[in-house]
Amino acid sequence: MKLIIGLGNPESRYNNTRHNIGFDLVDSLAAAFGSSFSSGKGKYLAAKITHRQETLMLIKPTTYMNLSGHAVVAAMNFHKVQKNDILVVCDDLNLPSGTMRLRAKGSAGGQNGLKHIIESLGSDEFARLRIGIRLGEMPPGSFSSFVLGKFSAEERVVMDRTLESCREAVLDFAKNGIEHAMNHYNKSAE
């Protein structure tokens, strides 16, 4: 079993925001496989899908982004999953919109959801899929207002295409592991 954890904020006012792209990805995977989310055994929602005989539990923390580690630990404990069987999906302000990066481990890179997961697990050795949300030069204003802002119509078209590739990358991770997925999908994103 693999846990695919999409990061985001739980309130509906955050739907379709850049910061919730992790939720968008797991929502699209659930929809593609005819699954739906229900309450998990902790502060998260879960949906189960099966792809090529591999079970994936799609997880959406119901904590805010900055407290995502609590939900990740609860889901890992309940499903008896180790760090090498999780993939955390989040936004990345440092990557251009429409790109993705898979990594086997690493720092939080300024992403507070990842930071809390690293703190909660006591390790940065878990796979992550970062989805770029930066639009060239940053618009004036705060980073938080940008990441919590909604996608424009043009951005949404780009992100929908990106989510297609991300879904394929997640399924590759589930079947073949992070190294295989990185070798295949990071090349096409560069």
Swiss-Prot record:
Keywords: Cytoplasm, Hydrolase, RNA-binding, tRNA-binding. Its main location: cytoplasm. Monomer. GO terms for biological process: protein quality control for misfolded or incompletely synthesized proteins; rescue of stalled ribosome. TRNA binds at Y14, Y64, N66, N112. This is Peptidyl-tRNA hydrolase. The keyword Cytoplasm applies. It comes from the Bacteria. GO terms for cellular component: cytoplasm. Hydrolyzes ribosome-free peptidyl-tRNAs (with 1 or more amino acids incorporated), which drop off the ribosome during protein synthesis, or as a result of ribosome stalling. The record marks N9 as: Discriminates between blocked and unblocked aminoacyl-tRNA. PANTHER family: PEPTIDYL-TRNA HYDROLASE. It catalyses: an N-acyl-L-alpha-aminoacyl-tRNA + H2O = an N-acyl-L-amino acid + a tRNA + H(+). The active site is at H19 (proton acceptor). GO terms for molecular function: peptidyl-tRNA hydrolase activity; tRNA binding. The record marks D91 as: Stabilizes the basic form of H active site to accept a proton. It comes from Chlorobium luteolum (strain DSM 273 / BCRC 81028 / 2530) (Pelodictyon luteolum).
